[in-house]
Curated annotation (Swiss-Prot):
One Pfam match: TOBE
PANTHER family assigned: DNA-BINDING TRANSCRIPTIONAL DUAL REGULATOR MODE, TRANSCRIPTIONAL REGULATOR MODE
Protein species of origin: Azotobacter vinelandii
Protein name: Molybdenum transport protein ModE
Described purpose of this protein according to its UniProt entry: Involved in the transport of molybdenum into the cell. May have a role in the early intracellular capture or metabolism of molybdenum.
Biological process annotations from GO: molybdate ion transport
Gene: modE
Superkingdom of source: Bacteria
Boundaries of every Mop domain copy: 131-197, 202-268
Alphabetical keyword list: Molybdenum, Repeat, Transport
Family: Belongs to the ModE family.
């Protein structure tokens, strides 16, 4: 039987999905070279929307933005890596070299033990992977815990300018071992997020994130709208095409994404 060799295609995962992968790193490298998300997406290759989705996810999960938009807009090459983004790319490539070396040693050992039959090991690795369908994924720090009759209200600071609240059961809070200062991930489905462009509108929803429309992906009935938040993060929601038109949504328009605290799902490491 032919000996099996693992090839490094490294991905760095969080409990809510992949944060960094070979494809995403190649996208970042292409942005650095091309200075344009459109041209970078073609180099990888990725669709224009998939490239922006990847960037939004990375920026939302990282403590600092990896990519920023600069004067010129989404259509004119106004995209560049931050210094933090460049450091992440360099770190990833250095880890990849070490990762390949470790895989070579592992492959040699497994071939000695199993004669190259490692399908069971590969199936185990596959079964342990996890992804989430929630479009909005935010990394944050617990800043407040308030006990209610049957639930907990959890305050999460996303960054210096944005904070959200989640309401979960006492059992869930105990299972997650929540405490002030603990890092958590907040997941919010795009279908749970609503939009308004009226600053004076009084809302009952606890979570209100003001930003600027940067992308509208149009569908036959619903549109997917993405707002850029001041911190470099983003939030995506699904609204009907009619509502999108009535609100006058277009790139550059200021809008507020709001959602109930009960719509927020929390996850933690380990």
């Amino acid at each position: 039987m032919t000996a099996t060799r693992f090839l490094a295609r490294m991905s760095l995962d969080t409990d809510v999905g992949t944060a960094l992968s070979d494809t995403r790193i190649r996208l970042l490298e292409a942005i650095e070279r091309e200075g344009s998300i459109n041209r970078a997406a073609k180099v990888v290759p990725l669709s224009y929307k998939a490239a922006w989705d990847a960037i939004d996810t990375m920026n939302n999960l990282a403590p600092e933005p990896l990519v920023v938009r600069v004067a010129g807009g989404r259509q004119g090459g106004g995209t560049q890596l931050t210094d933090y983004g460049r450091r992440i790319v360099a770190m990833y490539r250095a880890l990849e070299i070490e990762y390949q070396s470790a895989l070579d040693r592992l492959s040699e050992r497994l071939n000695e033990v199993t004669g190259g039959d490692i399908q069971a090991f590969q199936r185990l690795m596959h079964s342990m992977s996890m992804k989430t369908s929630a479009r909005n994924q935010f990394a944050g720090i617990v800043t407040g815990l308030r006990v209610g009759g049957v639930d907990y209200e959890v305050r999460i600071r996303l960054d210096a300018e944005n904070e959200i609240a989640a309401v979960i059961t006492k059992a869930s809070a105990e299972n997650l071992e929540l405490a002030i200062g603990k890092e958590v991930f907040a997941l919010v489905k795009s279908s749970s997020v609503m939009l308004t462009t009226e600053p004076s509108l009084k809302l009952t929803a606890r979570n209100q994130l003001w930003g600027e429309v940067i992308d509208i992906h149009e569908g036959p009935v619903n549109n997917e709208v993405t707002l850029a938040l001041p911190s470099g993060r983003s939030v995506t929601c699904v609204v009907t095409a009619d509502s999108c038109k009535a609100l006058g949504l277009a790139p550059g328009v200021a809008a507020c994404a709001f959602f109930k605290s009960s719509s927020v799902i929390l996850a933690v490491y380990g």
